[in-house]
Amino acid sequence: NYRSCENSCLSVTVNSNVYHEEDKMSTVAVQRSKTYDIVYIAVFAVIMAICSWISIPMTVPFTLQTFGVFMAVGVLGGKRGSLAVLVYILLGVIGVPVFAGFSGGLGILLNNTGGYIIGFLFSALVMWAMESLWGKKPVIQILSMVVGLIVCYAMGTIWFMVVYTRTTGAVGIGTVLGWCVIPFIIPDLVKIALAFVLSRRVRKLVPMQ
């Protein structure tokens, strides 16, 4: 009986130590995952800033911002990608010059083209929603990018019309589409194609939990 009790106690001790080590390993894994998340989100916020600095002045500046948004969600997934876009926008709001033309500040969001910047976040959220509903299949990823782009166009165009009407005068939707959307459709579709191909390759190199 003594030997049996001794063996039982030893077994309990060993099991307890094993569980303790597993808990420690689990905690370390969670902490490491959170660290990775923070780093990846920060990196893609910087990438979006760099994409915005590559700019051609137009009524709505031509930039690679949408490419940056699509890459962020494509590589990091909907949740992390959306957070990266949010961080990027918040950096701009507090004055960090991450927007087109090395600009920053809340005033950028409040001017004619600010709706397109806000639209980036809603594009990412739409992509996240579609990913959550239908997974990460290639056709879903491409479709989510296209739908996200349409959402960005819609928000930006409505915002532009409202602000322009208040500050300058009435303007028709056809005119605004001609200024702010139509010239960008083909370039944006090219960005979607590039982001789709590159994000699927980069995602294989990025360790994700």
Which ranges hold each PLM region?
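Hydrophobic transmembrane alpha-helices
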Residues: 25-82, 94
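Short helix-perturbing small/polar motifs within transmembrane alpha-helices
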Residues: 25-28, 43, 50, 106-154
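Membrane-interface elements of multi-pass transporters and channels
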Residues: 32, 54-58, 79, 94-98, ...
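Alpha-helical membrane-inserting segments
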Residues: 47, 51, 55, 72, ...
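Interfacial aromatic-anchored transmembrane helix boundaries in multi-pass membrane proteins
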Residues: 52-64, 89-123
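Alpha-helical transmembrane segments and their helix-entry boundary regions
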Residues: 81-85, 108, 141, 176
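Membrane-embedded alpha-helical hairpins and interfacial helices in multi-pass inner-membrane proteins
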Residues: 136-209
